[in-house]
């Protein structure tokens, strides 16, 4: 066996050379070079800038508050979807500033333009670029903030991370970044409506200490018209007036308040979401918590469920008149085991008070001196009313991505019709 090994070649030199008594320096061929020092490790490339969301339906937002404009690029949109600027403009108008006395007085038309990804009113399957110009910037309003950090704002942490920041309007930390999300969310909402008849609605359920009782809203029948009937976007007129009063009270005093947005999703296909790390409620929580000013997220019964026993909290099953498995209650919020069960998805997102306020606050300057700051600029006394379409958009982006995931993994082969719900286009027409 040893003699047979001597005939094999090793690194370009005869293996038999090792037994010839030659010096190590003469064992190698003239063409072979061994390194005399440790090689440098490869440079680690990290692609984690945090500006892209989604796996199959991918959205990248761009732009800053006081730059030339903002927008998004949508990659992975199915071809042949009827799409125009008007589909997005409806949602952008709901998000737009300057709508009422309880929002920022900044005047922007937020008119969007699709510059790629469509032809003859249909998507082509290639990336869709949507742009919205900024037209009402006032950079001088931020002169003091270039020197001193706004308490509870991203000013300081952006400096801590990058060592530089865009002062005017807060740059990427501004809520104007969400224009791209809302535009992309409009596309996602249209896909969901056309494909499965899925309807996403959000509304304001709390402003400061004004809390809308849950039993005053029937999530089965509440409509967009009811939500949009007042400037605070609360479907109950009585509580809407109370919420508007709470915002007006702090607005005239240069202060701000927070609140809660409730979001429901009707006609959700069963089977969306995957176990363990990519559970549907986990994806929804991440999406909603990525919005500016968010500080809390509840799903289904949420924290109130901790006061209940298992027998009180469990959603018991029954067979409905269409021979479908349903639940008598919906404390699970439409998701069990990280997977949608076909019931109404129900979640709540908490938003903190706007951090930029016209009241004197103690802070620290960039050169590390304690000082005081009274912030100028045009800011929402309460972000919650304008956050409603933002929450809807992020929920839509999650659900359309999960719809594509479900189709890719579980619908390639014939489904088990006794247990699974086949995914197929809905007969529902979009508005």
Curated annotation (Swiss-Prot):
**What subcellular locations does the record give?**
Plastid, Chloroplast
Q: Name one GO biological process term.
A: amino acid biosynthetic process
What's the Enzyme Commission number for this chain?
Answer: 4.2.3.5
The keyword Transmembrane helix belongs to this UniProt entry's keyword annotation:
no
Q: Which reaction does it catalyse?
A: 5-O-(1-carboxyvinyl)-3-phosphoshikimate = chorismate + phosphate
Principal EC category: lyase
Give the pathway.
Answer: Metabolic intermediate biosynthesis; chorismate biosynthesis; chorismate from D-erythrose 4-phosphate and phosphoenolpyruvate: step 7/7
What are the alphabetically sorted keywords of the record? Answer: Amino-acid biosynthesis, Aromatic amino acid biosynthesis, Chloroplast, Lyase, Plastid, Transit peptide
Q: Which GO terms describe its molecular function?
A: chorismate synthase activity; FMN binding
Query: Which domain of life does the UniProt lineage start with?
Result: Eukaryota
Q: Which PROSITE patterns match?
A: CHORISMATE_SYNTHASE_1 (PS00787), CHORISMATE_SYNTHASE_2 (PS00788), CHORISMATE_SYNTHASE_3 (PS00789)
Q: Which Pfam families match?
A: Chorismate_synt
Tissue-level expression reads: Predominantly expressed in flowers and roots and, to a lesser extent, in stems, leaves, and cotyledons.
Enumerate the residue ranges of region (Disordered).
93-141
Cofactor annotation? FMNH2
Q: Which GO terms describe its cellular component?
A: chloroplast; cytosol
PANTHER family, from UniProt? CHORISMATE SYNTHASE
Record family assignment: Belongs to the chorismate synthase family.
Describe the function of this protein.
Catalyzes the last common step of the biosynthesis of aromatic amino acids, produced via the shikimic acid pathway.
Q: Under what name is this protein listed?
A: Chorismate synthase 2, chloroplastic
What is the protein's species of origin?
Solanum lycopersicum (Tomato)
